[in-house]
């Protein structure tokens, strides 16, 4: 028997509402609720019930209705609600039968009972929506990350372990006494290009764009912003000494000519390898009244210090009191959890405001951003200043957005680590256990120079504030856009249209 879903009931209710609004009954005339309001209300109900496909359709219908009636503010609100629902639809594209078919095709030799064990939602992060179970677009990748026999067979077949093979020369190189903590500088020159087809853009209104740029840090020096184009539309820049690198532009859409709207950046910087040799006995005392100490030991949106997290931190460090040893204990605990690509859309859609540090604590799942936020939260819970840095990695062949973390030790400064890159040692098909341990040890307090830093910590707001609930504010690594006259959230186009190339010079 075919199940009657709630969307069928909603459809009937909408038809009734439309009949009443059209005056097709003999009821006394009253001030009607607009069809847009009805559609929006039912869309919100579907959204709250996790029926994201239905919610997306209803919000789009509401947007179209509001647009036709000239209510631009309501149309924009409906568009933004549709965007959040659509993010869920796009991140969860596969139903049960589809994901089973994909898993069988990708892992034909794995026993059926083992494959079935991967699919419960507490293992796969699946959701129930619109009467079906839907699976994350990253499900196949996560299966590989969670099963080292599969991952090592895969790297053996390729004859290469991503990240590990490229970075072993740094991790295994002996430190040079007296060379300092910032060594082996590499100068990089980068270009960024955002290209949006003109036919996607309306002819009126303004496209507001926040474009990422490099900033100065302890390891990233000599930052030069060579150009940002079109320069005539730049409204502000944060500068290279800020905590976040941004060029903000306002582009009149009436000025767009040709086949595409193009926004470009060009920049140069020098990145240093960071190498530390820390004597726990020489770690100084914190000045707990210092503004920087207070800043990096306080909670933020995604680095939360809940009672449960504080308890977890205490369980990890035990009776240890030395900040360095505590940070090391936290690092080794975090890298024991398998790398996992989560659904950021799910966290945004839930509207619960669940911090990423809590998501990792509760689920055990996290990617580079989530794990770095979790590490920072655990350190802060123990009175150790910590932060999560965002930007790009330029590891040859594996370039892309990336996040890692740092903790502060008096007498030494900011100590880097990269829990995600460290976990890559487990993927190696030919490394010994001793080599894996040596590699992980390197990334507990050192860092390679294949980095491009855009933001010094999680939750640093964009300047100016876009006041856009569809944007995740955890990290700023790719451009963000806001356009009140665009029929579709421009960030869908920006994600597809942004390209970065960074090369050694």
What are these regions (language model features)?
Residues 47, 239-243, 255-358, 362:
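Acidic low-complexity segments
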Residues 323-330, 364-379:
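Active-site nucleophilic cysteine motif
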């Amino acid at each position: 028997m075919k199940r009657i879903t709630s969307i069928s009931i909603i459809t009937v209710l909408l038809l009734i509402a439309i009949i009443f609004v059209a005056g097709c009954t003999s009821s006394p005339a009253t001030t009607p609720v607009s069809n847009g309001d009805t559609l929006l209300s039912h869309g919100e109900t579907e959204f709250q019930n996790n029926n994201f496909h239905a919610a997306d359709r209803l919000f789009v219908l509401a947007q179209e209705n509001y647009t036709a009636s000239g209510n631009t503010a309501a149309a924009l609100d409906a568009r933004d609600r549709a965007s959040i629902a659509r993010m869920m639809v796009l991140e969860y594209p596969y139903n049960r039968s589809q994901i089973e078919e994909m898993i069988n095709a990708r892992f034909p030799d794995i026993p059926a009972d083992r494959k079935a064990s991967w699919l419960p939602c507490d293992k796969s992060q699946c959701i129930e929506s619109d009467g079906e179970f839907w699976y994350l677009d990253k499900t196949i990748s996560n299966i590989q990350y969670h099963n080292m026999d599969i991952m090592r067979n895969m790297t053996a077949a390729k004859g290469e372990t991503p990240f590990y093979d490229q970075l072993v020369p740094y991790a295994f190189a002996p430190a040079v006494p007296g060379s300092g903590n910032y060594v082996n500088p590499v100068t990089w020159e980068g270009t960024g290009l955002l290209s949006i087809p003109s036919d996607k853009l309306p002819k009126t209104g303004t496209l507001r764009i926040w474009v990422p740029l490099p900033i100065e840090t302890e390891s990233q020096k000599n930052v030069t912003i060579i150009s940002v184009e079109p320069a005539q539309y730049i409204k502000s820049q944060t500068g290279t000494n800020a905590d976040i690198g941004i060029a903000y532009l306002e582009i009149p859409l009436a000025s767009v000519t040709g086949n595409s709207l193009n926004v470009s950046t060009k920049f140069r910087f020098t990145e240093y390898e960071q190498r530390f040799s820390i004597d726990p006995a020489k770690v100084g005392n914190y000045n707990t009244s210092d503004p920087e100490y207070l800043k990096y030991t306080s909670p933020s949106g995604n680095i939360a210090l809940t009672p449960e997290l504080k308890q977890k931190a205490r369980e990890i460090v035990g009776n240890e009191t030395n900040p360095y040893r505590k940070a090391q204990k936290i690092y080794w605990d975090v890298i024991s959890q398998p790398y996992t690509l989560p659904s950021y859309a799910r966290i945004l859609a839930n509207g619960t405001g669940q911090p990423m540090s809590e998501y990792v604590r509760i689920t055990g799942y996290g990617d580079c951003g989530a794990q770095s936020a979790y590490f920072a939260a655990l350190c802060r819970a123990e009175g150790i200043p910590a932060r999560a840095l965002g930007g790009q990695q330029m590891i040859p062949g594996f370039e892309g957005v990336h996040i890692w973390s740092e903790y502060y030790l008096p007498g030494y400064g900011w100590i880097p680590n990269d829990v995600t890159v460290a976990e890559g040692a487990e993927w190696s098909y030919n490394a010994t256990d001793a080599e894996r341990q040596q590699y992980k040890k390197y990334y507990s307090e050192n860092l390679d120079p294949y980095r491009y830093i855009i933001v010094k910590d999680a939750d640093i707001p964009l300047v100016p504030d876009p006041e856009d609930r569809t944007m995740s504010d955890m990290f700023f690594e790719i451009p963000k856009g806001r356009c009140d006259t665009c029929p579709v959230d421009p960030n869908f186009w920006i994600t597809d249209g942004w390209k970065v190339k960074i090369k050694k010079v």
